[in-house]
Amino acid sequence: MPPKRNFRKRSFEEEEEDNDVNKAAISEEEEKRRLALEEVKFLQKLRERKLGIPALSSTAQSSIGKVKPVEKTETEGEKEELVLQDTFAQETAVLIEDPNMVKYIEQELAKKRGRNIDDAEEVENELKRVEDELYKIPDHLKVKKRSSEESSTQWTTGIAEVQLPIEYKLKNIEETEAAKKLLQERRLMGRPKSEFSIPSSYSADYFQRGKDYAEKLRREHPELYKDRGGPQADGEAAKPSTSSSTNNNADSGKSRQAATDQIMLERFRKRERNRVMRR
C-alpha cells in the first residue's frame, strides 16, 4: 500500500485569531471613515450662512420669523432648498438708520464725555443761521417776474411778415459787399507792407515788371527809341548776311542771355508733383 500523505490542518485557535485580526482592521477603517465624515460635516456647518436681521417688526418676526423644523423623511436636495429659502427670506441689509436711536446714542456719548447737549445744539443752530445768511440772495439780484405785456416776445407774436421788394435785397447785398471790402482794406492797412507785397513767383514777377517798365518808357519817351531804331535798320540793310561763325556766336550769346529761372521753377514743380503722387 502506498504511504498516506500528511496534510497540515489549521487549528480552531488560529482561525479565531485571524478573525479577530480582520475584525480589528475593519473596525479601524470604519473609525477612520467616521472621523472623516464628522470632519466634513463640521466644515460644512462652519460654511453655513447665519441668519440676518429681519425686515419686519419684532411682533411680526415672532410669528413669521420662526423656521419650521425640517422633517427627517425629506431628501437631502429638498433640505438644501429649504435652507436657502429661509436664509434669503430672513437676511436683509439695514440701510436707513433710526433717527431716535442715533439721537439717543449721541446723547449718551455726550454725557460720557461731559458735554452739555443743549449748549451744543444752540451753537449748531447759530452756525446754521450764519450759513443761511451767507446763502441768502439780496433783493436787487433776485429775478423779477415779468408780465406778458413787458416781455418783448409778446409784441411780435401774431404779426404777419411782409415780403420786401427786390430793390431792398439788392441794396442790402451791395452794402454787405462794400462793408466786406472796407473791412478787408482795414485789415491790409493794419499789416506791415512786407507781408502782402511778396510775389508768388519771383522770376515771373521780375520779368513782368521789367516788361511793364519798358513799355512805360516807350510811351513816355518815344524819341529815345526812335533814335535807336534808325541805325539798327540801316545797319541791317548794309550788312544783309554774315558768316556762319558770327551767327553761331550770336546764337550762343542769345542762349546765354535767356533766363533759366522759369525753366528751373517748372522742373522743380514737376519733381514735387511726382513726389507727392508717389506717396
From Swiss-Prot:
Spans of biased composition, class Basic and acidic residues? 68-79, 217-229
What keywords does the record list, in alphabetical order?
Coiled coil, Nucleus
Q: What is its main location?
A: nucleus
Source domain of life: Eukaryota
Keyword Coiled coil listed? yes
Composition-biased stretches, type Polar residues, lie in 250-260
The transmembrane segments are none
Subunit and interaction comment: Interacts with COP1.
Which protein is depicted? Protein COP1 SUPPRESSOR 2
Q: Which gene encodes it?
A: CSU2
